[in-house]
Amino acid sequence: MDYNLIRITDSTVLSDAGICYYDPIEEVIKEIGSGYMMGTNPTSPVIHKLMLVIKNGSIKKVNIKIVKNKELESLFDIKILPGVTAPGISSFADIDAFNDLEISDGLQPYSLIPFHVYIKTKGPINALLNAPLELTYEF
């Protein structure tokens, strides 16, 4: 996927910023909704590439937080890292599970900032229903 060819419009995200994924079937960026599932593998960690989409040029800082609860913590280790290129599994070794990602650089209007979500299951689970990500931003 060539990021230079992706066009961000007013309809890409509903708010001033949003978390999106690339839909390879329609070949477009889509905002994550309530029915978005993240595939997992019971035998090895999986890394998903998502994108922070900025629509409003007045945003100064964005925080992406993994929302945790006891049930989620008992089933998964989830970590996030920024970056255009896909990190290897070992890149997540020194990152605490359920970490936050704060971004204050590169927040331009109609831009996207890639980040990666690492999911390791603690049992025979094939999907994580409803991505547990919370997005907050400051003007």
Residue ranges and their predicted role:
Residues 1-19, 138:
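Short, intrinsically disordered N-terminal pre-domain segments
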Residues 12-55, 67:
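Beta-sheet-dominated interaction scaffolds and their linkers
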Residues 54-56, 68-70, 119-123, 137-139:
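Beta-strand elements of well-folded, non-transmembrane domains
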